[in-house]
Amino acid sequence: MSTFSGDETAPFFGFLGAAAALVFSCMGAAYGTAKSGVGVASMGVMRPELVMKSIVPVVMAGVLGIYGLIIAVIISTGINPKAKSYYLFDGYAHLSSGLACGLAGLSAGMAIGIVGDAGVRANAQQPKLFVGMILILIFAEALALYGLIVGIILSSRAGQSRAE
């Protein structure tokens, strides 16, 4: 008769963390890209010469998906229960890593989308606002970077649950 230790479900939590990192980060990137893109399109009607300058929020939003991809790859390469023991601690560490990066990317994408939309529209009417918009976008992008850094730290904690 076998006993259930819970470690059989640990890879589920690890893979859930990888999925959460990618899905939530890409949701933030998609929202930021769509919202900023609408602003660029409507601004391009009034001032077509500013379209390339106003593409910055769209690019910054797109980078958020890459952060989620990085964490998802780090997590998925750390899950190999056949090669070494993978405990619940490891699964929870990977889950929290994915959630930290993914939800930070989602919130950063929402901020970038809203600021980018309003910023490029305002930039069409008052070009002096461009620098302020870029600074706000940088602070919004920093939110996702915080999630990426915490995600890397948390995923590196996996495997430290027991001395082997």
Swiss-Prot record:
Q: Name one GO cellular component term.
A: vacuole
InterPro entries membership: ATPase_proteolipid_c-like_dom, ATPase_proteolipid_csu, ATPase_proteolipid_su_C_euk, F/V-ATP_Csub_sf
Checking NCBIfam families in the record gives:
V_ATP_synt_C
**Organism of origin:** Arabidopsis thaliana (Mouse-ear cress)
Q: Where is this site: Essential for proton translocation?
A: 141
Q: How does it assemble?
A: V-ATPase is a heteromultimeric enzyme composed of a peripheral catalytic V1 complex (components A to H) attached to an integral membrane V0 proton pore complex (components: a, c, c'', d and e). The proteolipid components c and c'' are present as a hexameric ring that forms the proton-conducting pore.
At the top level, the lineage of the source is: Eukaryota
Which family is annotated? Belongs to the V-ATPase proteolipid subunit family.
Q: What is this protein's tissue specificity according to the annotation? A: Expressed in leaf, root, flower and silique.
Q: Which residues lie on this side of the membrane: Lumenal?
A: 1-11, 76-94, 155-164
Q: Which residues lie on this side of the membrane: Cytoplasmic?
A: 33-54, 117-128
- Which membrane topology term applies here? Multi-pass membrane protein
Tell me the function of this protein: Proton-conducting pore forming subunit of the membrane integral V0 complex of vacuolar ATPase. V-ATPase is responsible for acidifying a variety of intracellular compartments in eukaryotic cells.
Any single GO molecular-function term of the entry would be: proton-transporting ATPase activity, rotational mechanism
The portions of this protein that span the membrane are 12-32, 55-75, 95-116, 129-154
Which keywords belong to this entry? Answer: Hydrogen ion transport, Ion transport, Membrane, Transmembrane, Transmembrane helix, Transport, Vacuole
Q: Where in the cell is it found?
A: Vacuole membrane
State the protein's name.
Answer: V-type proton ATPase subunit c3
